[in-house]
Amino acid sequence: MRATLDGERFAARIELAMAMLHDSRGTGRSDHGLDTVRVGVVQSFARLWLTPRLAALEGTPPDLRIEMEIDNAHMALSDARIAIRLGRGGWPNVVSEPLFDEGLQPFACQKIAVELGPDPAARDLLRYPLIHDASEAGWRRWLTAQDLVYHPKGSDRTFGGHDLALIAAASGMGIALARKPYGSEQHERLGLVSVHPAVVDNVERFHIVTRSGARHGAIERLIQRLQSQARQSQA
């Protein structure tokens, strides 16, 4: 076991060294003349939230260049790298700042909404397949708040990203939990409609994750803009 722990520490040091080598120019100006900050994100966050706000985050006129790195694992952080990760925060050896709160609410396509009627009971939703965003935790939490217990059905489906879950719901595959405000723009574009008024807080949130210690001015600017965009999305 000791050798395994030593191996993990060695791998972490190698990962950090490679990140520092890759970022050897730090947030220095490149050929485009802008400070570059690399942001590690999961693909669904890049699609649903970060990319639509990229121009605003880079400034007007642009004074930052944001390079997204799609990664499902915790990437090595440096003077030129931050990450945005979903969870409860409090990760060791890093600084994590929550970006926005999320509310979970059931949404479906128009056909299912019509079949359910204008005022369905929470139990009525269980007649349809439930669509999960990566795990069953969201639906378990929502149903518990309605005094119901989640029992998995063979027709339920799990998708690896929130964007995919919403697309599946829009195609009529079942009912998904929209994560508001995170996926609000997407479910509006897809024509999804609410099928129950109850909104339950999501215990997980996206966090801005940076390494401990002083931060480069470009990273500070980006964090301030991320927080500003987050406030606007919740307004």
Model-predicted regions and their roles:
Residues 197-235:
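A late-sequence structural motif
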Residues 38-40, 83, 107, 131, ...:
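Short, well-ordered beta-strand segments
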Residues 77, 89-173, 178, 182-203, ...:
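C-terminal regulatory
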Residues 34-92:
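Central regulatory/effector-binding core of bacterial HTH transcription factors
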Residues 15, 25, 43, 47-59, ...:
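Amphipathic alpha-helical segments that line or abut small-molecule/effector binding pockets
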Residues 30-37, 124-126:
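Immediate post-signal peptide segment of exported/extracytoplasmic ligand-binding proteins
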Residues 2-30:
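Alpha-helical "hinge/linker" immediately C-terminal to small N-terminal DNA-binding modules
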